[in-house]
Amino acid sequence: MNPNQRIITIGSVSLTISTICFFMQIAILITTVTLHFKQYEFNSPPNNQVMLCEPTIIERNITEIVYLTNTTIEKEICPKPAEYRNWSKPQCGITGFAPFSKDNSIRLSAGGDIWVTREPYVSCDLDKCYQFALGQGTTLNNVHSNNTVRDRTPYRTLLMNELGVPFHLGTKQVCIAWSSSSCHDGKAWLHVCITGDDKNATASFIYNGRLVDSVVSWSNDILRTQESECVCINGTCTVVMTDGNATGKADTKILFIEEGKIVHTSKLSGSAQHVEECSCYPRYPGVRCVCRDNWKGSNRPIIDINIKDHSIVSRYVCSGLVGDTPRKSDSSSSSHCLNPNNEKGDHGVKGWAFDDGNDVWMGRTINETSRLGYETFKVVEGWSNPKSKLQINRQVIVDRGDRSGYSGIFSVEGKSCINRCFYVELIRGRKEETEVLWTSNSIVVFCGTSGTYGTGSWPDGADLNLMHI
Protein backbone atom coordinates (compact mmCIF):
# COMPACT_ATOMS: atom_id res chain seq x y z
CA MET A 1 0.00 0.00 0.00
CA ASN A 2 1.57 3.25 -1.10
CA PRO A 3 1.67 6.25 1.25
CA ASN A 4 -1.30 7.96 -0.34
CA GLN A 5 -3.51 4.88 0.06
CA ARG A 6 -2.41 4.53 3.70
CA ILE A 7 -3.39 8.15 4.44
CA ILE A 8 -6.81 7.69 2.81
CA THR A 9 -7.45 4.47 4.76
CA ILE A 10 -6.53 6.04 8.13
CA GLY A 11 -8.73 9.05 7.36
CA SER A 12 -11.68 6.84 6.43
CA VAL A 13 -11.38 4.81 9.64
CA SER A 14 -11.17 7.98 11.74
CA LEU A 15 -14.22 9.46 10.04
CA THR A 16 -16.18 6.26 10.63
CA ILE A 17 -15.26 6.17 14.33
CA SER A 18 -16.19 9.86 14.70
CA THR A 19 -19.55 9.28 13.05
CA ILE A 20 -20.27 6.33 15.36
CA CYS A 21 -19.36 8.43 18.42
CA PHE A 22 -21.60 11.26 17.20
CA PHE A 23 -24.62 8.96 16.86
CA MET A 24 -23.89 7.38 20.25
CA GLN A 25 -23.96 10.85 21.87
CA ILE A 26 -27.32 11.58 20.21
CA ALA A 27 -28.69 8.25 21.50
CA ILE A 28 -27.49 8.99 25.05
CA LEU A 29 -29.10 12.45 24.92
CA ILE A 30 -32.44 11.05 23.69
CA THR A 31 -32.39 8.36 26.39
CA THR A 32 -31.66 10.92 29.14
CA VAL A 33 -34.47 13.25 28.05
CA THR A 34 -36.93 10.35 27.71
CA LEU A 35 -36.15 9.01 31.18
CA HIS A 36 -36.48 12.52 32.69
CA PHE A 37 -39.98 13.04 31.32
CA LYS A 38 -41.03 9.49 32.21
CA GLN A 39 -40.07 10.24 35.82
CA TYR A 40 -42.02 13.54 35.74
CA GLU A 41 -45.11 11.68 34.49
CA PHE A 42 -44.89 9.16 37.34
CA ASN A 43 -44.46 11.86 40.00
CA SER A 44 -46.88 14.50 38.72
CA PRO A 45 -50.65 14.48 38.29
CA PRO A 46 -52.23 14.86 34.86
CA ASN A 47 -52.59 18.44 33.68
CA ASN A 48 -56.35 18.41 34.23
CA GLN A 49 -56.14 16.99 37.76
CA VAL A 50 -56.20 19.37 40.75
CA MET A 51 -54.30 18.41 43.89
CA LEU A 52 -56.36 19.46 46.89
CA CYS A 53 -55.09 20.18 50.35
CA GLU A 54 -57.16 18.98 53.26
CA PRO A 55 -59.01 20.44 55.03
CA THR A 56 -60.61 22.71 52.43
CA ILE A 57 -60.55 25.89 54.57
CA ILE A 58 -57.26 27.54 53.64
CA GLU A 59 -56.08 30.80 55.13
CA ARG A 60 -52.81 31.15 53.20
CA ASN A 61 -51.26 29.43 50.17
CA ILE A 62 -47.49 29.08 50.47
CA THR A 63 -45.44 27.95 47.43
CA GLU A 64 -41.90 26.84 48.15
CA ILE A 65 -39.54 26.90 45.13
CA VAL A 66 -36.35 24.84 45.35
CA TYR A 67 -33.64 25.28 42.67
CA LEU A 68 -31.77 22.03 41.99
CA THR A 69 -29.10 22.27 39.27
CA ASN A 70 -31.18 23.29 36.24
CA THR A 71 -34.46 21.75 37.48
CA THR A 72 -37.19 23.78 39.23
CA ILE A 73 -39.48 21.86 41.59
CA GLU A 74 -42.61 23.60 42.93
CA LYS A 75 -44.04 22.16 46.14
CA GLU A 76 -47.30 23.36 47.71
CA ILE A 77 -47.31 23.29 51.50
CA CYS A 78 -50.79 22.73 52.93
CA PRO A 79 -51.40 25.33 55.68
CA LYS A 80 -52.64 24.51 59.14
CA PRO A 81 -56.43 24.32 59.21
CA ALA A 82 -58.25 27.36 60.57
CA GLU A 83 -59.39 26.79 64.14
CA TYR A 84 -62.10 28.34 66.24
CA ARG A 85 -60.94 30.85 68.82
CA ASN A 86 -61.26 29.75 72.44
CA TRP A 87 -59.87 32.77 74.29
CA SER A 88 -58.44 30.53 77.02
CA LYS A 89 -55.38 32.67 77.77
CA PRO A 90 -55.41 34.83 80.91
CA GLN A 91 -56.20 38.52 80.86
CA CYS A 92 -53.14 40.75 80.52
CA GLY A 93 -52.07 42.64 83.60
CA ILE A 94 -52.10 46.37 82.84
CA THR A 95 -51.18 49.66 84.48
CA GLY A 96 -53.43 51.73 82.24
CA PHE A 97 -54.08 52.45 78.56
CA ALA A 98 -51.90 53.73 75.71
CA PRO A 99 -53.02 55.51 72.49
CA PHE A 100 -53.62 53.12 69.59
CA SER A 101 -55.65 54.70 66.75
CA LYS A 102 -57.59 57.81 65.69
CA ASP A 103 -59.41 58.19 62.37
CA ASN A 104 -60.08 61.99 62.25
CA SER A 105 -63.15 61.41 60.06
CA ILE A 106 -64.84 64.76 60.68
CA ARG A 107 -61.71 66.83 60.03
CA LEU A 108 -61.11 64.89 56.80
CA SER A 109 -64.73 65.46 55.75
CA ALA A 110 -63.97 69.16 55.29
CA GLY A 111 -62.02 68.32 52.15
CA GLY A 112 -63.13 64.86 51.06
CA ASP A 113 -65.96 62.38 50.70
CA ILE A 114 -66.29 60.71 54.09
CA TRP A 115 -69.40 58.83 55.27
CA VAL A 116 -71.75 60.23 57.88
CA THR A 117 -71.79 57.67 60.71
CA ARG A 118 -72.60 56.95 64.30
CA GLU A 119 -72.48 53.94 66.67
CA PRO A 120 -68.88 52.96 65.82
CA TYR A 121 -66.99 49.99 67.27
CA VAL A 122 -63.84 47.95 66.79
CA SER A 123 -63.28 44.20 66.45
CA CYS A 124 -60.33 42.07 65.35
CA ASP A 125 -59.80 38.86 63.41
CA LEU A 126 -56.64 36.78 63.82
CA ASP A 127 -54.46 39.23 61.90
CA LYS A 128 -55.97 42.72 61.86
CA CYS A 129 -58.36 45.02 63.68
CA TYR A 130 -61.28 46.66 61.90
CA GLN A 131 -63.49 49.63 62.64
CA PHE A 132 -67.22 49.43 62.08
CA ALA A 133 -69.94 52.08 62.12
CA LEU A 134 -73.52 52.56 61.03
CA GLY A 135 -73.50 54.79 57.96
CA GLN A 136 -76.33 57.16 57.08
CA GLY A 137 -76.32 56.45 53.34
CA THR A 138 -74.52 59.70 52.57
CA THR A 139 -71.24 61.52 52.82
CA LEU A 140 -70.95 64.59 55.02
CA ASN A 141 -70.33 66.98 52.11
CA ASN A 142 -73.76 66.15 50.66
CA VAL A 143 -77.22 67.66 51.22
CA HIS A 144 -78.46 64.18 52.18
CA SER A 145 -76.49 64.64 55.41
CA ASN A 146 -79.18 67.03 56.67
CA ASN A 147 -81.18 65.59 59.61
CA THR A 148 -78.87 62.60 60.08
CA VAL A 149 -79.49 62.92 63.81
CA ARG A 150 -82.18 60.26 63.18
CA ASP A 151 -81.25 56.79 64.46
CA ARG A 152 -83.29 54.51 62.21
CA THR A 153 -83.71 54.87 58.46
CA PRO A 154 -83.73 52.32 55.60
CA TYR A 155 -80.54 53.91 54.23
CA ARG A 156 -78.32 53.01 57.16
CA THR A 157 -75.73 50.31 56.49
CA LEU A 158 -72.93 48.66 58.45
CA LEU A 159 -69.54 49.90 57.24
CA MET A 160 -66.26 48.03 57.70
CA ASN A 161 -62.70 49.26 57.19
CA GLU A 162 -59.29 48.35 58.51
CA LEU A 163 -58.73 50.23 61.77
CA GLY A 164 -57.40 53.72 61.11
CA VAL A 165 -58.90 53.98 57.61
CA PRO A 166 -61.76 56.52 57.56
CA PHE A 167 -65.00 55.50 55.88
CA HIS A 168 -64.32 56.78 52.35
CA LEU A 169 -66.41 56.14 49.22
CA GLY A 170 -64.69 52.81 48.62
CA THR A 171 -65.74 51.46 52.02
CA LYS A 172 -67.52 48.12 52.06
CA GLN A 173 -71.19 48.17 53.12
CA VAL A 174 -71.46 44.85 54.92
CA CYS A 175 -75.22 44.82 55.38
CA ILE A 176 -78.33 46.97 55.86
CA ALA A 177 -78.50 47.94 59.52
CA TRP A 178 -79.45 50.62 62.03
CA SER A 179 -78.23 48.40 64.88
CA SER A 180 -75.43 45.84 64.69
CA SER A 181 -72.75 43.63 66.19
CA SER A 182 -69.80 41.80 64.60
CA CYS A 183 -67.22 39.21 65.65
CA HIS A 184 -64.74 36.73 64.15
CA ASP A 185 -64.90 33.11 65.34
CA GLY A 186 -61.43 32.21 64.06
CA LYS A 187 -62.67 31.11 60.65
CA ALA A 188 -64.97 33.86 59.39
CA TRP A 189 -66.83 37.04 60.31
CA LEU A 190 -70.32 37.04 61.80
CA HIS A 191 -72.41 40.18 61.39
CA VAL A 192 -75.72 40.74 63.17
CA CYS A 193 -77.64 43.43 61.29
CA ILE A 194 -81.02 44.87 62.31
CA THR A 195 -83.19 46.99 60.01
CA GLY A 196 -86.83 47.57 59.11
CA ASP A 197 -89.90 49.03 60.78
CA ASP A 198 -89.68 49.97 64.45
CA LYS A 199 -92.52 47.60 65.28
CA ASN A 200 -91.49 44.76 62.96
CA ALA A 201 -87.73 44.86 62.42
CA THR A 202 -85.60 41.99 61.11
CA ALA A 203 -82.23 40.81 62.40
CA SER A 204 -80.11 39.19 59.68
CA PHE A 205 -77.23 36.87 60.58
CA ILE A 206 -74.50 37.01 57.96
CA TYR A 207 -71.59 34.58 58.21
CA ASN A 208 -68.62 34.45 55.85
CA GLY A 209 -70.39 36.85 53.51
CA ARG A 210 -73.61 34.82 53.28
CA LEU A 211 -77.01 35.27 54.88
CA VAL A 212 -77.51 32.21 57.08
CA ASP A 213 -80.38 33.02 59.46
CA SER A 214 -82.80 35.74 60.54
CA VAL A 215 -85.21 36.57 63.35
CA VAL A 216 -88.10 39.02 63.57
CA SER A 217 -88.81 41.50 66.36
CA TRP A 218 -90.33 39.60 69.31
CA SER A 219 -91.83 42.54 71.21
CA ASN A 220 -92.57 44.87 68.31
CA ASP A 221 -90.71 47.78 69.89
CA ILE A 222 -87.35 48.52 68.20
CA LEU A 223 -85.36 45.28 68.24
CA ARG A 224 -81.77 46.32 68.96
CA THR A 225 -78.37 44.85 69.80
CA GLN A 226 -74.95 45.68 71.20
CA GLU A 227 -73.36 48.31 68.89
CA SER A 228 -70.02 46.65 69.66
CA GLU A 229 -68.35 43.30 69.13
CA CYS A 230 -69.96 39.99 69.97
CA VAL A 231 -67.79 37.14 71.30
CA CYS A 232 -67.15 33.63 69.91
CA ILE A 233 -65.72 30.74 71.93
CA ASN A 234 -65.03 27.36 70.29
CA GLY A 235 -67.34 28.18 67.38
CA THR A 236 -70.29 29.46 69.43
CA CYS A 237 -70.93 33.19 69.24
CA THR A 238 -73.17 35.05 71.67
CA VAL A 239 -75.01 38.31 71.08
CA VAL A 240 -77.30 40.21 73.47
CA MET A 241 -80.48 41.63 71.92
CA THR A 242 -83.27 43.69 73.47
CA ASP A 243 -86.78 44.45 72.25
CA GLY A 244 -89.21 46.62 74.18
CA ASN A 245 -89.50 49.80 76.20
CA ALA A 246 -86.37 51.97 76.19
CA THR A 247 -87.16 53.39 79.64
CA GLY A 248 -89.20 50.58 81.15
CA LYS A 249 -89.57 46.82 81.20
CA ALA A 250 -88.12 45.27 78.05
CA ASP A 251 -87.47 41.75 76.75
CA THR A 252 -83.77 40.88 76.51
CA LYS A 253 -82.52 37.62 74.99
CA ILE A 254 -79.09 36.13 74.48
CA LEU A 255 -78.69 34.33 71.16
CA PHE A 256 -76.18 31.52 70.62
CA ILE A 257 -74.99 31.33 67.03
CA GLU A 258 -72.83 28.79 65.21
CA GLU A 259 -71.54 29.72 61.74
CA GLY A 260 -74.42 32.15 61.38
CA LYS A 261 -77.16 29.77 62.52
CA ILE A 262 -79.13 30.45 65.71
CA VAL A 263 -78.78 27.27 67.77
CA HIS A 264 -80.25 28.45 71.08
CA THR A 265 -81.94 31.46 72.67
CA SER A 266 -81.87 32.21 76.40
CA LYS A 267 -83.93 34.82 78.18
CA LEU A 268 -82.24 37.27 80.49
CA SER A 269 -82.28 36.02 84.07
CA GLY A 270 -80.86 37.38 87.30
CA SER A 271 -81.32 40.76 88.92
CA ALA A 272 -80.59 43.15 86.03
CA GLN A 273 -83.69 45.29 85.49
CA HIS A 274 -82.95 46.82 82.10
CA VAL A 275 -80.24 45.89 79.59
CA GLU A 276 -79.18 47.61 76.39
CA GLU A 277 -76.04 48.12 74.28
CA CYS A 278 -73.81 45.59 76.01
CA SER A 279 -70.02 45.71 75.78
CA CYS A 280 -68.93 42.07 75.90
CA TYR A 281 -65.58 40.36 76.35
CA PRO A 282 -64.36 36.74 76.58
CA ARG A 283 -63.93 35.46 80.14
CA TYR A 284 -63.08 31.83 79.44
CA PRO A 285 -64.94 29.53 79.43
CA GLY A 286 -67.79 32.04 79.16
CA VAL A 287 -68.63 35.56 78.04
CA ARG A 288 -69.10 38.61 80.26
CA CYS A 289 -70.97 41.78 79.28
CA VAL A 290 -71.28 45.19 80.91
CA CYS A 291 -74.31 47.06 79.65
CA ARG A 292 -76.56 50.13 79.89
CA ASP A 293 -79.55 50.35 82.23
CA ASN A 294 -81.71 52.99 80.58
CA TRP A 295 -84.46 52.77 83.20
CA LYS A 296 -83.43 52.57 86.85
CA GLY A 297 -79.69 52.53 87.39
CA SER A 298 -76.62 54.66 86.73
CA ASN A 299 -74.61 51.63 87.87
CA ARG A 300 -74.07 49.28 84.94
CA PRO A 301 -75.64 45.81 84.60
CA ILE A 302 -73.44 42.72 84.19
CA ILE A 303 -74.41 39.61 82.23
CA ASP A 304 -72.46 36.35 82.59
CA ILE A 305 -73.11 33.91 79.74
CA ASN A 306 -72.36 30.20 80.04
CA ILE A 307 -71.49 28.90 76.58
CA LYS A 308 -71.90 25.21 77.44
CA ASP A 309 -75.30 25.09 79.14
CA HIS A 310 -76.68 28.43 77.85
CA SER A 311 -77.41 29.66 81.38
CA ILE A 312 -77.49 33.38 82.14
CA VAL A 313 -76.70 35.25 85.36
CA SER A 314 -77.05 39.02 85.70
CA ARG A 315 -76.32 41.65 88.37
CA TYR A 316 -74.65 45.09 88.56
CA VAL A 317 -71.11 46.47 88.77
CA CYS A 318 -70.50 46.92 92.49
CA SER A 319 -68.24 49.98 92.35
CA GLY A 320 -69.39 53.00 94.34
CA LEU A 321 -68.04 55.11 91.48
CA VAL A 322 -70.66 54.45 88.80
CA GLY A 323 -70.11 54.46 85.06
CA ASP A 324 -73.27 55.72 83.32
CA THR A 325 -74.30 59.23 82.30
CA PRO A 326 -76.26 60.95 83.78
CA ARG A 327 -75.20 60.11 87.35
CA LYS A 328 -74.77 61.71 90.75
CA SER A 329 -71.47 63.23 91.80
CA ASP A 330 -68.89 60.77 93.07
CA SER A 331 -69.22 62.08 96.60
CA SER A 332 -72.95 61.36 96.73
CA SER A 333 -73.32 58.35 94.40
CA SER A 334 -74.02 54.87 95.71
CA SER A 335 -74.16 51.44 94.17
CA HIS A 336 -75.39 47.92 94.69
CA CYS A 337 -73.98 44.63 93.46
CA LEU A 338 -77.36 43.05 92.73
CA ASN A 339 -79.79 45.86 91.96
CA PRO A 340 -79.95 49.20 90.16
CA ASN A 341 -79.06 52.15 92.38
CA ASN A 342 -82.15 54.17 91.33
CA GLU A 343 -80.01 57.28 90.84
CA LYS A 344 -80.64 59.20 87.61
CA GLY A 345 -81.29 55.90 85.88
CA ASP A 346 -83.54 57.29 83.16
CA HIS A 347 -81.55 57.65 79.95
CA GLY A 348 -77.88 56.68 79.71
CA VAL A 349 -75.02 56.02 77.32
CA LYS A 350 -73.26 52.92 76.02
CA GLY A 351 -70.10 52.24 78.02
CA TRP A 352 -67.81 49.52 79.34
CA ALA A 353 -66.01 48.09 82.34
CA PHE A 354 -64.07 44.90 83.01
CA ASP A 355 -62.97 42.99 86.07
CA ASP A 356 -59.36 42.70 87.24
CA GLY A 357 -59.48 40.38 90.22
CA ASN A 358 -61.54 42.23 92.83
CA ASP A 359 -60.85 45.54 91.09
CA VAL A 360 -62.62 47.04 88.10
CA TRP A 361 -61.38 49.14 85.19
CA MET A 362 -63.95 51.47 83.67
CA GLY A 363 -64.41 54.39 81.32
CA ARG A 364 -67.03 57.16 81.52
CA THR A 365 -67.77 60.74 80.51
CA ILE A 366 -66.14 63.32 82.76
CA ASN A 367 -69.29 65.43 82.82
CA GLU A 368 -71.92 63.89 85.12
CA THR A 369 -74.97 64.98 83.10
CA SER A 370 -73.94 65.12 79.43
CA ARG A 371 -71.65 63.40 76.95
CA LEU A 372 -68.64 65.64 77.47
CA GLY A 373 -65.08 64.55 78.21
CA TYR A 374 -63.89 61.00 78.81
CA GLU A 375 -61.79 59.36 81.53
CA THR A 376 -60.61 55.90 82.56
CA PHE A 377 -59.49 54.58 85.93
CA LYS A 378 -59.32 51.54 88.17
CA VAL A 379 -61.52 51.24 91.27
CA VAL A 380 -59.83 49.17 93.97
CA GLU A 381 -62.22 46.38 95.07
CA GLY A 382 -64.76 47.87 92.65
CA TRP A 383 -65.79 44.45 91.36
CA SER A 384 -66.73 43.14 94.80
CA ASN A 385 -67.46 46.07 97.16
CA PRO A 386 -70.36 48.52 96.62
CA LYS A 387 -68.75 51.03 98.97
CA SER A 388 -65.51 51.12 97.01
CA LYS A 389 -64.58 54.60 95.79
CA LEU A 390 -60.79 54.38 95.78
CA GLN A 391 -59.82 55.51 92.28
CA ILE A 392 -56.29 54.92 90.94
CA ASN A 393 -54.48 55.17 87.59
CA ARG A 394 -56.87 57.81 86.24
CA GLN A 395 -56.34 58.99 82.67
CA VAL A 396 -58.03 61.74 80.69
CA ILE A 397 -58.82 60.63 77.14
CA VAL A 398 -60.93 63.64 76.12
CA ASP A 399 -60.92 66.92 78.06
CA ARG A 400 -64.03 67.91 80.00
CA GLY A 401 -65.18 70.56 77.52
CA ASP A 402 -64.95 68.39 74.37
CA ARG A 403 -67.69 66.08 73.14
CA SER A 404 -67.56 62.31 73.53
CA GLY A 405 -70.33 59.73 73.09
CA TYR A 406 -70.67 55.96 73.10
CA SER A 407 -67.74 53.80 74.14
CA GLY A 408 -67.11 50.08 74.15
CA ILE A 409 -64.61 47.31 74.65
CA PHE A 410 -62.83 44.89 72.32
CA SER A 411 -60.32 42.14 73.05
CA VAL A 412 -57.01 41.34 71.33
CA GLU A 413 -55.25 38.00 71.81
CA GLY A 414 -51.49 38.19 72.24
CA LYS A 415 -48.88 35.47 72.55
CA SER A 416 -49.44 34.89 76.24
CA CYS A 417 -52.50 36.88 77.31
CA ILE A 418 -55.66 38.68 76.21
CA ASN A 419 -55.53 42.46 76.16
CA ARG A 420 -58.51 44.74 76.66
CA CYS A 421 -58.92 47.79 74.46
CA PHE A 422 -61.63 50.42 74.15
CA TYR A 423 -62.86 53.03 71.69
CA VAL A 424 -64.62 56.36 72.29
CA GLU A 425 -67.14 57.81 69.85
CA LEU A 426 -66.50 61.53 69.31
CA ILE A 427 -69.88 62.90 68.21
CA ARG A 428 -70.14 66.20 66.32
CA GLY A 429 -73.06 68.19 64.93
CA ARG A 430 -76.67 68.12 66.02
CA LYS A 431 -78.39 68.21 68.43
CA GLU A 432 -75.83 70.11 70.49
CA GLU A 433 -74.03 71.96 67.68
CA THR A 434 -76.79 73.65 65.67
CA GLU A 435 -74.55 75.58 63.28
CA VAL A 436 -74.62 72.48 61.06
CA LEU A 437 -77.52 70.26 59.98
CA TRP A 438 -75.77 66.89 60.25
CA THR A 439 -74.69 64.49 63.00
CA SER A 440 -71.59 62.29 62.64
CA ASN A 441 -68.55 61.06 64.55
CA SER A 442 -64.90 60.12 64.57
CA ILE A 443 -63.23 57.70 66.99
CA VAL A 444 -60.19 57.38 69.22
CA VAL A 445 -58.89 54.00 70.38
CA PHE A 446 -56.69 52.99 73.34
CA CYS A 447 -55.34 49.60 74.45
CA GLY A 448 -54.17 48.24 77.77
CA THR A 449 -50.46 48.49 78.55
CA SER A 450 -48.19 47.14 81.25
CA GLY A 451 -45.73 49.92 80.50
CA THR A 452 -45.63 53.60 81.34
CA TYR A 453 -47.63 56.36 79.67
CA GLY A 454 -48.06 60.13 79.66
CA THR A 455 -50.98 62.55 79.51
CA GLY A 456 -52.98 64.29 76.81
CA SER A 457 -56.41 64.78 75.28
CA TRP A 458 -57.62 63.40 71.95
CA PRO A 459 -60.86 65.19 70.94
CA ASP A 460 -62.44 65.11 67.48
CA GLY A 461 -60.83 68.46 66.72
CA ALA A 462 -62.88 69.58 63.70
CA ASP A 463 -63.65 73.31 63.29
CA LEU A 464 -67.31 73.33 62.27
CA ASN A 465 -66.90 76.79 60.73
CA LEU A 466 -64.87 75.08 58.00
CA MET A 467 -67.42 72.33 57.44
CA HIS A 468 -70.36 71.79 55.10
CA ILE A 469 -73.50 73.12 56.79
Question: How would you describe each model-predicted region?
Answer:
Residues 76, 289-291:
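Extracellular cysteine-rich, disulfide-stabilized repeat modules
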Residues 97, 119-120, 173, 177-181, ...:
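Repeated scaffold domains used in trafficking and secretory/extracellular systems
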Residues 165-167, 213-216, 264-267, 314, ...:
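A short beta-strand motif characteristic of beta-propeller blades
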